[in-house]
């Protein structure tokens, strides 16, 4: 009996071999596509479905690619020939919400924004807010260790997960972590799985750490600067002053101009970079006033509003970055992080690389935590070698400045060739050994993160 026959025999009509499903599973939002269609898509509805799929895959040594909404930007969920796609989007229930304990138990397929809309009814929220929050799943957020605009103040996914239910490659179900605020029993396998991009197991449930909804007004600040370096230095000055905005976003001149063009807004002055900042909590007005003072002292033209609608409009300009880039051509959206004080130097490096390669690299940044998203624009579907060469220089520049290859998008298959440069050979090999402990047969998402684990 073939693998496909075994899947159909045990799982029935949740096994999908339609051309549409198979084509969709070849790509994510990175622009990269696998070389061919996978074997089948299993639309799991229960933990038992996941376990059955993994047992069949293990018995037949068939590779499995776990997939949520396919909104990733590093190719981690792209499936190719001979692989089973295990889709978790149908596992989208909220199993439990405990406002008294500030926790929720959810299945992996629920969308980030859908979860928070439901949680808001009980006065709580889950803090990670990636730009894809309207369309990305909690399972995908966990797989990549996602962040977002609010993470400088409220943390990333790793700060907001208490426990995970994990199906291993052989189909066994593990319950990792705890429901309590504290817990140091044994090794922290929950944190190990977060950000592992489907290499260690299949997340089928998550116990999430919630927060109370933040009460009171929210202030929004915009500040314009004559150069992106000045804007980056001003954002570092805000942090150095001991101020903690909820959101601090930076748009360089090219990204700001592209978004204004997309939204039919008046064109900014040439070379203008912009900071968009949001404060919240009991001290929001005082914090905003102090931040405005720092920005003006740093040479910025700053304005503040406490009008909620205007604040959302201003943040909407930043959130329109991805469609603005898509309007310019095919986009390789990159993701590096550096210490916040090194952001001006990182923008200097980007300018150097632009000049050396004769290209434009529109860049936005989560300035509150030093996470930059340079965008490489090109024609066609495949990334040209020259663009990869420029990206490689950019990655190495981030490493030289004490940073990292990825702050929130993950390694996937697009950055695996540079991973050993950051980790060093010993740590790279140790991490590959850890993958083999969880998945001795190497059937979970092979070729991703570690090209040959």
Task: Mark where each language-model region is.
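Noncatalytic alpha-helical scaffold of FAD-dependent oxidoreductases
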Residues: 1-453
């Amino acid at each position: 009996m073939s693998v496909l026959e075994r899947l159909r025999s045990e799982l029935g009509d949740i096994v999908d071999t339609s051309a549409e499903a198979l084509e969709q599973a070849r790509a994510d939002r990175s622009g990269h596509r696998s070389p061919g269609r996978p074997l089948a898509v299993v639309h799991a509805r229960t933990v038992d479905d996941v376990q059955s799929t993994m047992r069949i895959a293990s018995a037949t040594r068939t590779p499995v690619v776990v997939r949520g909404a396919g909104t990733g930007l590093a190719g981690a969920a792209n499936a190719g020939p001979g692989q089973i796609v295990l889709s978790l989007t149908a596992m989208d229930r909220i199993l439990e919400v405990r406002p008294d304990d500030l926790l929720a138990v959810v299945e992996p397929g629920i969308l980030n924004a859908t979860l928070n809309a439901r949680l808001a009814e009980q006065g709580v929220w889950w803090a990670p807010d990636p730009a894809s929050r309207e369309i990305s799943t909690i399972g995908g957020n966990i797989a990549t260790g996602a962040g977002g605009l609010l993470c400088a103040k409220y943390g990333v996914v790793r700060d907001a997960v208490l426990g995970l239910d994990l199906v291993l490659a052989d189909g066994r179900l593990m319950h990792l972590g705890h429901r309590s605020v504290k817990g140091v029993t044994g090794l922290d396998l929950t944190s190990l799985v977060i950000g592992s991009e489907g290499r260690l197991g299949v997340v089928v449930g998550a116990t999430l750490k919630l927060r109370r909804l933040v009460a009171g007004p929210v202030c929004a600040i915009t500040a314009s600067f004559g150069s992106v370096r000045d804007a980056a230095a001003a954002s570092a000055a805000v942090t150095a002053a001991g101020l903690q905005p909820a959101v601090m976003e930076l748009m360089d001149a090219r990204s700001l101009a592209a978004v204004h063009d997309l939204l039919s807004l008046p064109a900014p002055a040439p070379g203008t970079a912009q900071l968009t900042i949001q404060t919240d909590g009991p001290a929001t007005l005082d914090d905003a006033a102090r931040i405005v003072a720092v920005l003006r002292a740093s040479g910025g033209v700053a304005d503040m509003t406490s009008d909620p609608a205007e604040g959302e409009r201003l943040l909407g300009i930043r959130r329109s970055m991805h469609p603005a880039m898509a309007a310019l051509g095919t986009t390789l959206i990159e993701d590096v992080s550096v210490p916040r004080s090194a952001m001006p130097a990182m923008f200097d490096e980007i300018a150097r690389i632009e000049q050396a390669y004769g290209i434009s690299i529109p860049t936005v940044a989560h300035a509150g935590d030093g996470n930059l998203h340079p965008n490489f624009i090109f024609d066609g579907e495949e990334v040209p070698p020259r663009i990869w060469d420029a990206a490689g220089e950019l990655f190495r520049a981030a490493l030289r400045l004490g940073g990292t290859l990825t702050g929130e998008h993950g390694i996937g298959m697009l950055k695996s060739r540079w991973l050993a440069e950051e980790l060093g050979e010993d740590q790279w090999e140790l991490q590959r050994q850890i993958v083999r402990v969880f998945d001795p047969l190497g059937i979970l998402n092979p070729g991703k993160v570690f090209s040959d684990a």
